[in-house]
């Protein structure tokens, strides 16, 4: 997760977030080149003492500064469109997780298993362990297997919410009366944090998301323990 004074993205934990990192770097490279070029042109014009009193138009340069921006936009738009389609793709999921947003907590249902559902509340600061993370710890973690394609169905019971986990490259609106879906693939074990990213009332800041990624064997044991509880 992000640390103090970190200026970059969180470490990617899914292939899609890695692709978003690459796209960000690609776009920033284009923007830096344009910024340097424009600064150089403005600097040379500012310190240039030459005057042309007879310049009325310049069809050649007007054509150039129309074609070049179009070319730059294509360079940025093509990988962006590719990512948009990839983010919307749901590829044969092995597990389905249903998430319901409430004021102000999350409910989870594992649709592929019987009677596995729970609520996830933020742990207050005065009840948290010393090693805990303020405003991010929850009483029930959402456990998911790594190296597995997961589909998540997202809705809300009252107002608009948004289920967001930056390390996985996920941000999906939770809308009352509507079921949104997306998929993701966690490529390493760990604990990944997120929060509601849609202002949903007084306690909007106290709706953390805590994903624990484990191997398949540990996930099956967790499922068995939850089924017996």
Curated annotation (Swiss-Prot):
Keywords: Copper, Electron transport, Magnesium, Membrane, Metal-binding, Mitochondrion, Mitochondrion inner membrane, Respiratory chain, Translocase, Transmembrane, Transmembrane helix, Transport. The keyword Translocase applies. It is a multi-pass membrane protein. It is found in: Mitochondrion inner membrane. One of its GO terms (cellular component) is mitochondrial inner membrane. The keyword Cytoplasm does not apply. The chain crosses the membrane at residues 27-48, 63-82. Cu cation A2 binds at residues 196, 198, 200, 204. It comes from the Eukaryota. It catalyses: 4 Fe(II)-[cytochrome c] + O2 + 8 H(+)(in) = 4 Fe(III)-[cytochrome c] + 2 H2O + 4 H(+)(out). Cu cation A1 binds at residues 161, 196, 200, 207. Residues 49-62 are mitochondrial matrix. Component of the cytochrome c oxidase, the last enzyme in the mitochondrial electron transport chain which drives oxidative phosphorylation. The respiratory chain contains 3 multisubunit complexes succinate dehydrogenase (complex II, CII), ubiquinol-cytochrome c oxidoreductase (cytochrome b-c1 complex, complex III, CIII) and cytochrome c oxidase (complex IV, CIV), that cooperate to transfer electrons derived from NADH and succinate to molecular oxygen, creating an electrochemical gradient over the inner membrane that drives transmembrane transport and the ATP synthase. Component of the cytochrome c oxidase (complex IV, CIV), a multisubunit enzyme composed of a catalytic core of 3 subunits and several supernumerary subunits. The complex exists as a monomer or a dimer and forms supercomplexes (SCs) in the inner mitochondrial membrane with ubiquinol-cytochrome c oxidoreductase (cytochrome b-c1 complex, complex III, CIII). This is Cytochrome c oxidase subunit 2. It comes from Sympetrum striolatum (Common darter dragonfly). The gene is COII.
């Amino acid at each position: 997760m992000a640390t103090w004074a970190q200026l970059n993205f969180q470490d990617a934990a899914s292939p899609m977030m890695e692709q978003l990192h690459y796209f960000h770097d690609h776009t920033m490279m284009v923007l830096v080149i344009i910024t340097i070029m424009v600064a150089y042109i403005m600097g040379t014009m500012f310190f240039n003492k030459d005057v042309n009193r007879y310049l009325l138009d310049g069809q050649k340069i007007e054509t150039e500064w129309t074609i070049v921006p179009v070319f730059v936009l294509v360079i940025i738009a093509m990988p962006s469109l590719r990512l948009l389609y990839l983010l919307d793709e749901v590829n044969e999921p092995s597990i389905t997780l249903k998430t319901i947003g409430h004021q102000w907590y999350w409910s989870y249902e594992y649709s592929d298993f019987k009677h596995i559902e729970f609520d996830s509340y933020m742990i207050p600061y005065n009840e948290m362990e010393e090693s805990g993370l303020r405003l991010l710890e929850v009483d029930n973690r959402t456990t998911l297997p790594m190296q597995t394609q997961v589909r998540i169905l997202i809705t809300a019971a009252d107002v608009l919410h948004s289920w967001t986990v930056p390390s996985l490259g996920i941000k999906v609106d939770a809308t009352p009366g509507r079921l949104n879906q997306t998929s993701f693939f966690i490529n390493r074990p760990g604990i990944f944090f997120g929060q509601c990213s849609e202002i949903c009332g007084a306690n909007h800041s106290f709706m953390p998301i805590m994903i624990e990624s484990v191997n398949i064997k540990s996930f099956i044991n967790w499922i068995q323990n939850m089924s017996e509880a």
